[in-house]
């Protein structure tokens, strides 16, 4: 996959994420970089992450098992994170704040909540697609970014975000609407970069090292493009992640109102570590991986004009990890 001088970088990029913090965890470098170079960058969040666990003792009563007020609290965290990433118009939510609820993990009772984003109601599914269609028609992004068919790590809300995104775009394309984007990208974590960063690292007190299967990783050979963050982008991602203090513990020495305990650990190659509530150590990498999930008018016999690759901070892979049919649909894709 190569860059083409005849096409410009996209002017409008929309990220579709399941919960507050996903925009920073999975795509923080790309959000920061696209904002930095002047692209109209928007983040659409589908739920408030009400079923999340909470780091630290102070705000434990916000969880769904207690007062169930965590979702509203996380709106504030998302607002701060977006500011760090250069997205200044504030949070946007599919259908409005709290229209759809965090479904929790698969096979849990929470997925049967009447507002669960990944619930099995056909009426809810249709409404979600229509709500995303309204956003696409209004904002007309050239590039959409979300997750792959497995949602990255199997969370039902991530899988639903993928399915709703692809279905909305399919309907726009089938109707011949100009609002159809040019391409959809799936955010993934490069396995080689992850393992290289974690080699020889000292695990912070109370945290643990990732075991096989703990972190969803994709081998570089299956990745189409890499976002190389500048020091500014990496710092923005780290600050955005730290803003989600109920969900993420960043080992940069910072103490917060949410979590007064500090950790200060970097990898031998200089990356800060972070952990979710499971306390599995992970590096904040200066690179993000992206798979090309769909491209408009794909032709498998020619090099395609791929908008995202015209950003200077995006490095294409040596080959194309996904093969696309003439209808632009990834072979093997069901969503």
Swiss-Prot record:
Q: E.C. number, please?
A: 3.5.1.103
Q: EC top class, in one word?
A: hydrolase
Which named protein is this? 1D-myo-inositol 2-acetamido-2-deoxy-alpha-D-glucopyranoside deacetylase
**Keyword annotations for this protein?**
Hydrolase, Metal-binding, Zinc
* Residues binding Zn(2+): 19, 22, 158
Q: Which PANTHER family match?
A: 1D-MYO-INOSITOL 2-ACETAMIDO-2-DEOXY-ALPHA-D-GLUCOPYRANOSIDE DEACETYLASE (PTHR12993:SF26), N-ACETYLGLUCOSAMINYL-PHOSPHATIDYLINOSITOL DE-N-ACETYLASE-RELATED (PTHR12993)
Co-factor: note: Binds 1 zinc ion per subunit.
Which cysteines link up through disulfide bonds? Answer: none
């Amino acid at each position: 996959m190569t860059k083409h001088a005849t096409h410009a970088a996209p002017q409008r990029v929309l990220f579709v994420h399941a919960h507050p913090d996903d925009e920073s965890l999975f795509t923080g470098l790309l959000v920061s970089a696209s904002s930095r170079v002047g692209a109209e960058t928007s983040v659409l969040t589908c739920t408030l992450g009400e079923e999340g666990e909470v780091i630290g003792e102070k705000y434990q009563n916000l969880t769904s098992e207690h007062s169930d007020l965590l979702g509203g609290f996380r709106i504030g965290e998302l607002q701060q994170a977006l500011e760090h990433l250069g997205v200044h118009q504030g949070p946007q939510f599919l259908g409005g704040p709290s229209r759809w609820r965090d479904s929790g993990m698969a096979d849990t009772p929470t997925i049967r909540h009447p507002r669960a984003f990944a619930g099995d109601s056909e009426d809810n599914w249709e409404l979600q697609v229509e709500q995303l269609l309204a956003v696409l028609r209004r904002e007309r992004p050239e590039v959409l970014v979300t997750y792959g068919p497995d949602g990255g790590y199997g969370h039902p809300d991530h899988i639903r975000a993928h399915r709703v995104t692809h279905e909305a775009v399919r309907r726009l394309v089938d109707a011949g609407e100009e609002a159809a984007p040019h391409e959809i990208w799936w955010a993934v974590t490069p396995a080689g970069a992850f393992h290289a960063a974690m080699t020889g690292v000292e695990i912070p007190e109370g945290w643990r090292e990732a075991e096989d299967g703990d972190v969803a990783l994709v081998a570089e050979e299956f990745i189409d493009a890499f976002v190389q963050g500048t020091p500014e982008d990496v710092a923005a991602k780290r600050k955005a992640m730290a803003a989600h203090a109920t969900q993420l513990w960043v080992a940069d020495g910072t103490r917060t109102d949410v979590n007064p305990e500090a950790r200060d650990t970097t990898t031998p190659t200089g990356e800060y570590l972070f952990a979710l509530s499971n306390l599995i150590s992970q590096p904040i990498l200066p690179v993000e991986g992206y798979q090309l999930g769909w491209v408009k008018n794909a032709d498998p016999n020619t090099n395609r004009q791929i908008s995202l690759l015209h950003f200077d901070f995006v490095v294409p892979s040596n080959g194309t990890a996904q093969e696309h049919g003439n209808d632009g649909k990834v072979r093997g894709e069901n969503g």
